């Protein structure tokens, strides 16, 4: 019996060992990842120091581009270790530690290699970058009270320094400062601060700072539906052409929203399509969803029907569901279904800031219905039109048809005496200017794309040409080469 019990218990021992080993392996992998994160951010600090010394902002730009990856590695042990390595003991380190929580009670402090404490304070650029990392970490933890205080301290550091090497980090800091104010529903309080920083950035030719601040101000105005002020800002300021693609995409989206609210649908559609093209195609799914919703509504307002493949994209299919139903209602000219879509999805349309534009679509639904009626019937009475559109009286139908004829929606004539609408024969679209205008639009886009590509290329500095010889020097050198060749030929002849 004893031997059988021992035999039965024997296979269980290796399982326990495997579980313990797997737990130890996971703990070791976690420590390695944290150590690598510390080393990576330390390397970022060295890159920033190199940029300050060499006056080359591209090193800082490279560090900031990796911010989305870095923010996922900001564990508690990582930021505490970095604070010790970057800041010497004193009030400065204590101020930084105020934004980093202590280890949980009863939890054992992770055993990373003992960090080498800093001897002197970091340069302002490294200080601002680490402060920015702390602010991003607090936002990810949804600790708004600490994030607000951290953001204010970061702005004090940025404003207090007059260094061009700090411009790129300052631009990123402005964005997160505005984000904190938005989460606190207090965007109005920072508007004057953003305006003052925009004036300073413009005077200093800080192009990235200008782009970020203009976008923050536009978002600030649009949050409160201040379209007139936003339009004035766009007209009075110049968005820098050298701004990053992400900032250009944001600016074009805000510009599209402003133009759509101002009834300039063609311009709005052009800006929104450019925003979609400039946005990252694989990442930034939320931004693409937001822009695509507005593009669909603007296309419907222009009288166009979006293609079905737009709604079939995997990343957009679910979010564009209500807009697909809206498109179907407009395409069929069904007023009843249009009203049902507004009732069912009105709250979502308000959250997407498209409800006001969608209300304007009622006229387009009626126009589409009248156009389809005009194509289907060569002659129809106002009573039948009123019944098909669900209108109250034939007089309303007659008024709507007359307005549609005046606007060029349909080619027809009204005969009040006989009481019917007679449709004219449809003309061939290729005999009009429509194809010419469509080709012109495509050619203009290709030319603009070519010009932007040429501007985005990097060229050698002008000093490169100074080392090249002039035409006169080249002629003298060629003459000397010819004389030398003749002398060598004569020497060869003498040798024979």
UniProtKB/Swiss-Prot annotation:
Species for this entry: Anopheles gambiae
Known function: Acts as a regulatory subunit of the 26 proteasome which is involved in the ATP-dependent degradation of ubiquitinated proteins.
Gene3D superfamilies: 1.25.40.570
Superkingdom of origin: Eukaryota
Protein name: Probable 26S proteasome non-ATPase regulatory subunit 3
Presence of keyword Phosphoprotein: no
Region of interest (Disordered), ranges: 458-480
Annotated transmembrane regions: none
Keyword annotations from UniProtKB, A to Z: Proteasome
GO molecular-function terms, A-Z: enzyme regulator activity
One record GO biological process: regulation of protein catabolic process
InterPro entries to which the protein is assigned, alphabetical: 26S_Psome_reg_C, CSN3, PCI_dom, WH_DNA-bd_sf
Ranges where the PCI domain occurs: 249-428
Biased composition (Basic and acidic residues): 464-480
GO cellular component, one term: proteasome regulatory particle, lid subcomplex
Magnesium found in the keyword field: no
